[in-house]
Amino acid sequence: MTQTAAQQPSPRLVSGHGLATTAADGAVLDVWFPAPVAGPLSAADASLRDTLRALAADDADRGTTQAVVELEVDLDAAPASTADAWLRLHALSHRLARPNELNLDGVFGLLTNVVWTNHGPCAVADFELTRARLRARGAVQVYGVDKFPRMTDYVVPSGVRIGDADRVRLGAHLAEGTTVMHEGFVNFNAGTLGNSMVEGRISAGVVVGDGSDVGGGASIMGTLSGGGTQRIVVGEHVLLGANSGVGISVGDDCVVEAGLYVTAGTRVSVLQDGEAAHTVKAVDLSGVPNLLFRRNSTTGGVEALPRAGRTVELNAALHAN
C-alpha cells in the first residue's frame, strides 16, 4: 500500500517589474516597483515593463545606471538579493503583506547605505565629488544617509495623511484612515491595521489596531536592537497618552496614562474595587483588554484598573482621508 505525501502549501508570492539604480561599483542603490502584485510574475502588468524601459537612464554626474528588473519572490523564504529586499519593502507599503507576515531575515545586509538627494540616490563613496558635479544643476539637498528611504518617494498609499514624509520609512504599512502627524514616526515592517492617529513612534515589528491613538511623544518598543524578540501589538481602540511608552502588548480598549512607561518588568498593582488585589509584572498583563495603566500620584506605584464597558473613540473627521 502506498502513502500519499502530504500536500505542500502553495508559496505566498509577490512579484513586479522594477527600475533598479546601480552605482559604478555595482552596488544596487535602489529599486522602484511602482505596481507590485500578490501572485506570480505572470499576474503583473507586462506593459509596465516597457514604460520602465523608456524611463531608464544613466546619470554621469551621479555615476549611476538604470535597468529594468523582473522579480517574483516567496514571502516565506529569506530575501536572496537587494532587489528582492526592495520588493518586500514595497509589498509592505503597498499593503500586499502585513508587518511580521513576511520573511525579512538578513535584509540589512542586502541593502546599501545610500545618500538620498533631490537628484536621486547616490553612492556614499566620493559623494563630495558627486555633489560638486550635481551643483551645476542647482542646489543639492541631502535628505539622509541610510539604507531605507522615505516611503513617499516610492509609495503613496491611498487614504492616509502624513504630516512629515521624513518620518515614515519605506516598508511601513499604513492602513486606510491612518493619520501620521508631524512628530509621528513609523519604521519598516511596522504600522497600522485600521483608522489610527499616530503622534508617537511605532518601532519595527509593532502593529497598531483599528481605532487606536498613539499620543504625542509616545514610544512603542521594537525588536531591532537590545536583543528584544517580543513582537508588540497595540490592540483596537487603545490610547497611549502623550509621552507614554510600552514594552508589552496592549489589549483592546486599554489606556496608558500620559507620561507612564510600562516595560515588561514593571511591577503593577492590579486594583479591584479600588483596592490592590495582587501585584504582577507588566508582562503578565500583556494583551489583556479593558485596562487603565496609571501611576499613583501619592505612592508613585504603577496600577492597572479595569475599565470594562468603555472604549476609545477617534474623531472620525480626522481620519476621512
Swiss-Prot record:
- Which keywords belong to this entry? Acyltransferase, Amino-acid biosynthesis, Cytoplasm, Diaminopimelate biosynthesis, Lysine biosynthesis, Magnesium, Metal-binding, Transferase
The record's catalysed reaction(s) read: (S)-2,3,4,5-tetrahydrodipicolinate + succinyl-CoA + H2O = (S)-2-succinylamino-6-oxoheptanedioate + CoA
Name the Gene Ontology molecular function terms of this record.
2,3,4,5-tetrahydropyridine-2,6-dicarboxylate N-succinyltransferase activity; magnesium ion binding
What pathway annotation does it carry? Answer: Amino-acid biosynthesis; L-lysine biosynthesis via DAP pathway; LL-2,6-diaminopimelate from (S)-tetrahydrodipicolinate (succinylase route): step 1/3
InterPro entries assigned to the protein according to its UniProt record, in alphabetical order: DapD_actinobacteria (IPR019875), Hexapep (IPR001451), THDPS_M (IPR032784), THDPS_M_sf (IPR038361), Trimer_LpxA-like_sf (IPR011004), Type2_DapD (IPR026586)
The chain's disulfide connectivity reads none
Give the E.C. number(s): 2.3.1.117
User: Which residues make up the binding site for Mg(2+) 1?
Assistant: 166
What top-level branch of life does the organism fall under? Bacteria
Task: Give the matching Pfam families.
Answer: Hexapep_2 (PF14602), THDPS_M (PF14789)
Give the annotated active site. 199 (acyl-anhydride intermediate)
The main location is cytoplasm
Which cellular component, as a GO term, is one annotated location? cytoplasm
| Enzyme superclass (EC) | transferase
One GO biological process this protein is involved in is: diaminopimelate biosynthetic process
The UniProt record gives the binding positions of succinyl-CoA as 201, 216, 219, 242, 257-258, 265, 281, 294-297
Q: Does the keyword rRNA processing apply?
A: no
At which positions is Mg(2+) 2 bound? 183
NCBIfam families reported in the protein's UniProt record: DapD_actino
Similarity remark: Belongs to the type 2 tetrahydrodipicolinate N-succinyltransferase family.
Q: What does the protein in this record do?
A: Catalyzes the conversion of the cyclic tetrahydrodipicolinate (THDP) into the acyclic N-succinyl-L-2-amino-6-oxopimelate using succinyl-CoA.
Describe the protein's quaternary organization and the partners it interacts with: Homotrimer.
This one is known as 2,3,4,5-tetrahydropyridine-2,6-dicarboxylate N-succinyltransferase
Species per Swiss-Prot/TrEMBL record: Micrococcus luteus (strain ATCC 4698 / DSM 20030 / JCM 1464 / CCM 169 / CCUG 5858 / IAM 1056 / NBRC 3333 / NCIMB 9278 / NCTC 2665 / VKM Ac-2230) (Micrococcus lysodeikticus)
